[in-house]
Design a protein with these regions (language model features):
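Alpha-helical transmembrane segments and their helix-helix packing motifs
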Residues: 2-267
């Protein structure tokens, strides 16, 4: 007869990191980010801006097909946008919204406030430059002409919808957005394989896109792209398209950026 008390039960090892280990890993990542040379951080940030722009392009190309219902279109479009964060996470680029989690390292006093703010500024600017570069490439490649130029109208429509909302609403949508982004990064950090990381981030990112929340780096692509298309004569009948100018872009990005930052602080 087997003595149950003496038997050894072996439990499978968890296939992801525990929350405490995720926090520790996030702190280490924050220290690494804070100590990156400016040139390297800027280059990695440009890559991240470009990657998010690729996700934004995929999203607007998909939205140009109106055969799906509104809800299905938003959900599938959100999954298309996931391309951007998957590339950022797997390739190791520097994304401003994800870097809001550097406050974990600040909280544990492993970096200073000046280091964190400096890293944020460098990455924010780098993200913007990378996104603008993709705007240029998309324009020169004539991608907007696809689907009988419906893609161009989709670009204007998406952008116009972001500059016709009041500042406070954009700010709170930015907070909601980065709740999901921080959760996606947190889940991605927990994963031990590339598949774990990719699968883990899909739903949080698809959810924030489907809900229409405001991601400042995504808007660094959406807004200039929409403005360029409107200047080329597309989307003339889209409500609010006339606000697609430098002032409108600055208005949106200021609110979205501050909202995205706030949730990183609150997360800790």
């Amino acid at each position: 007869m087997i003595d149950i008390a003496d038997s050894k039960v072996e439990y499978p090892a968890p296939d992801c990191l525990a929350p405490a280990a995720i926090e520790a890993k996030t702190e280490v990542a924050g220290v690494t980010k804070a100590n990156l040379p400016v040139a390297k951080a800027f280059l990695l940030a440009m890559f991240a801006g470009a990657f998010i722009a690729f996700g934004g392009l995929f999203f607007t190309v998909f939205l140009s097909d109106s055969t799906l219902g509104w809800g299905a279109q938003r959900v599938v479009g959100g999954l298309c946008f996931c391309l951007g964060l998957v590339l950022v996470l797997v390739c190791g680029a520097e994304l401003f919204t994800g870097n809001s989690l550097m406050v974990c390292a600040l909280k544990s006093k492993k970096i200073t406030l000046v280091q964190m703010l400096k890293a944020w500024v460098v990455v924010w600017v780098g993200n913007f430059v990378g996104a603008l570069f993709i705007v240029f490439l998309v324009y020169m490649a004539g991608i907007y002409k696809l689907n009988g130029e419906a893609v161009a109208n989709s670009m204007v429509s998406v952008a116009a919808g972001k500059v016709t909302v009041d500042w406070v609403t954009i700010f709170f949508r930015g907070i909601l957005c980065n709740i999901f982004v921080c959760l996606a990064v947190w889940i991605g950090t927990a994963g031990k394989t590339v598949v774990d990381k990719v699968v883990g981030i899909l739903l949080p990112i698809a959810a924030f896109v489907a809900c229409g929340f405001e991601h400042c780096v995504a808007n660094m692509y959406f807004l200039p792209m929409g403005a360029v298309m409107h200047a080329c004569g597309y989307g003339a009948d889209v409500a609010g398209a006339d606000a697609l100018n430098a002032a409108g872009i600055a208005f949106n990005l200021s609110a979205a950026t501050l909202g995205n930052i706030e949730i990183g602080r609150a997360h800790v």
